[in-house]
Amino acid sequence: MLGTLFGSAIGGALAVAGAPVALAAMGFTGTGIAAASIAAKMMSAAAIANGGGVAAGSLVATLQSAGVLGLSTSTNAILGAAGAAVGALL
């Protein structure tokens, strides 16, 4: 039981703390999309596919928003719950 609680706590904390780190590592930073990053390649591909612009609400637009503005409280809650569930299983 204690191991499950510990795993849940660690999993939840890692998910919430790791998401912004993962976004930044992909190139979705607080100042926008980093040059020559995975995010830049994703944006280029999305723009080409959409005839020159990135569609509002697309994956790239959503990740860019999360990179600049941060994750919402509800998103952090969902990430925490998912991380806790995975942590409890491990």
Swiss-Prot record:
It is a multi-pass membrane protein. InterPro entries: IFI6/IFI27-like, IFI6/IFI27-like_sf. Disruption phenotype: Homozygous knockout mice exhibit no obvious phenotype, having normal growth rates, survival, fertility and litter sizes. No organ pathology is detected. However, they display decreased restenosis, the narrowing of blood vessels, upon vascular injury. Its main location: nucleus. The keyword NAD does not apply. Keywords: Membrane, Nucleus, Signal, Transcription, Transcription regulation, Transmembrane, Transmembrane helix. Induction: Up-regulated by interferon. Up-regulated by vascular tissues injury. Residues 1-24 form the signal peptide. Pfam families: Ifi-6-16. It is found in: Nucleus inner membrane. One of its GO terms (cellular component) is nuclear inner membrane. Disulfide bonds: none annotated. One of its GO terms (biological process) is response to virus. The chain crosses the membrane at residues 28-48, 67-89. Homodimer. Interacts with SKP2. Interacts with NR4A1. May interact with BCL2. Belongs to the IFI6/IFI27 family. May be involved in the interferon-induced negative regulation of the transcriptional activity of NR4A1, NR4A2 and NR4A3 through the enhancement of XPO1-mediated nuclear export of these nuclear receptors. Through the regulation of NR4A1 transcriptional activity, may play a role in the vascular response to injury. This is Interferon alpha-inducible protein 27-like protein 2A. The lineage of its organism: Eukaryota, Metazoa, Chordata, Craniata, Vertebrata.
